[in-house]
């Protein structure tokens, strides 16, 4: 458990330093600016592909978080999407936490939260 907390702190530190990886010339075209996603530069004369100083950074393995905590919630729990009360029975309260789906209504949401409290399961978006 102590190792997991240490790795989560390392991951938070890495994420703070990590730049936004935007595609080459994202500033030039509105369709790139409004939908910012990474695309690898493939041009033969591309300064970004050659990794010249002053050009935007490219994603590489060094920016990744530790494998043991990759994909976990910042609290250290693995997120499980819950649609009904029956889904709560499948959750291991020591390593997993529930996230109530967006499509669940108010009445069922209250039932899920009450049952989670009985089972000792953490709900990430209880409101």
UniProtKB/Swiss-Prot annotation:
The keyword Ribonucleoprotein applies. Residues 37-65 are annotated as: Disordered. PROSITE patterns: RIBOSOMAL_L32E. GO terms for molecular function: structural constituent of ribosome. Pfam families: Ribosomal_L32e (PF01655). One of its GO terms (biological process) is translation. GO terms for cellular component: cytosolic large ribosomal subunit. Keywords: Ribonucleoprotein, Ribosomal protein. CDD domains: Ribosomal_L32_L32e. Residues 37-48 have a biased composition (Basic and acidic residues). Belongs to the eukaryotic ribosomal protein eL32 family. This is Large ribosomal subunit protein eL32. The gene is rpl32e.
């Amino acid at each position: 458990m102590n190792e997991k907390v240490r790795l989560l702190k390392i991951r938070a530190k890495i994420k703070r330093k990590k730049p936004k990886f935007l595609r080459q010339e994202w500033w030039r075209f509105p369709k790139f600016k409004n939908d910012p996603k990474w695309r690898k530069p493939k041009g033969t004369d591309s300064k970004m592909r050659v990794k010249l100083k002053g050009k935007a950074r490219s994603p590489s393995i060094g920016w990744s978080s530790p494998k043991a905590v990759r994909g976990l919630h910042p609290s250290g729990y693995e997120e499980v999407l819950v649609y009904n009360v029956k889904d709560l029975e499948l959750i291991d309260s020591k390593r997993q936490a529930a996230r109530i789906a967006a499509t669940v209504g108010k009445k069922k949401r209250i039932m899920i939260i009450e049952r989670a409290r009985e089972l000792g399961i953490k709900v990430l978006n209880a409101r």
